[in-house]
Structures are given as structure tokens and as C-alpha cells.
Regions:
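Conserved N-terminal alpha-helix of the aminotransferase class I/II PLP-enzyme fold
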Residues: 34-94, 115-122
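Active-site catalytic pocket residues across diverse enzymes, especially alpha/beta-hydrolases
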Residues: 99, 123-124
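N-terminal glycine-rich, Lys/His-bearing helix-loop that initiates the first secondary-structure elements
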Residues: 1-47, 54
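Short, flexible coil/turn micro-motifs enriched in small/turn-prone residues
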Residues: 18, 83, 109-110
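Glycine-centered flexibility sites
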Residues: 15, 23, 88, 103, ...
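Solvent-exposed alpha-helices and their adjacent loops that cap or buttress functional pockets
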Residues: 21-24, 75-77, 98-99
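Conserved PLP-anchoring active-site segment centered on the Schiff-base-forming lysine
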Residues: 98-116
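Structural motif
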Residues: 28-29, 81-83, 104-105
């Protein structure tokens, strides 16, 4: 799709190519947790385990990057990328590790999600 297409058109179509195996116009939802490998670290489809990435999330990331990656005049912005995660804790971990350095202080509420609290308390 072109960055000149409207927001709604890009939201519906960007990142979505017909499935090469079935011809399905809408990309299928991939529920698989693991993907075949030709050898250790040799990933013919580019995916290994759904926790680190899968085709469904890749389509979502492409579409979101397209929607967020244009300026007010519809021109593409360079280096714009979207990231989708397998869980909320994975997203929290990525954001916190990208923003904080060892020794930084972070204030979180005492009723924060337990996994996030343990991440902050024991890892960061």
C-alpha cells in the first residue's frame, strides 16, 4: 500500500499479502507454538518459537508501523517500527530494560502485577 492511501485503507490492508500456500486474502492466524527448523538456528520461515515471534504478530507489526510511520502529510518516516509481544510481561520487560540503566530508581505501585514487581525487584 502507498503512504498516500488513507488511514482506514492502510489499517485494513498494510502488512497483508495473500497466503502463498492457500491464496487466502486475509492472513491466517497462526496458533502454532513452534516452527520447523532445517537445522539448529536455520529457520526457513524466519520463526522459531511463538514467544519470540510468529507470522501473525509480524503482520500486526507491519500494519501498526505503517499507521504510525507517516507524518501529517502522509509521507513515510524512516526507521519507524512496531513491536508486538507474546505477553504483557514481555512488553513491560522490553520497555523497562530500554529505559532504565543499572542503579536507576523506579517507583511502581504496591499493587503492580506480580511478575512486573518481581522483574523490577529482582532483575532490574
Amino acid at each position: 500500500m502507498s503512504t498516500q492511501d488513507g488511514f482506514a485503507t492502510r489499517a485494513i490492508h498494510d502488512g497483508q499479502q495473500p497466503d502463498p500456500l492457500t491464496g487466502a486474502v486475509i492472513p491466517p492466524i497462526h496458533l502454532s507454538t513452534t516452527f520447523a527448523q532445517d537445522g539448529v538456528g536455520v529457520l526457513p520461515g524466519g520463526f522459531e518459537y511463538s514467544r519470540s515471534g510468529n507470522p501473525t504478530r509480524a503482520v500486526l507489526e507491519t500494519c501498526l508501523a505503517s499507521l504510525e510511520g507517516v507524518d501529517s502529510e502522509g509521507q513515510a518516516l524512516i526507521g519507524v517500527r512496531a513491536m508486538a509481544f507474546a505477553s504483557g510481561l514481555a512488553a513491560s520487560d522490553a520497555v523497562l530494560r530500554s529505559l532504565l540503566a543499572p542503579g536507576d530508581h523506579l517507583v511502581i505501585p504496591n499493587d503492580a502485577y506480580g511478575g512486573t514487581f518481581r522483574l523490577v525487584d529482582a532483575v532490574l
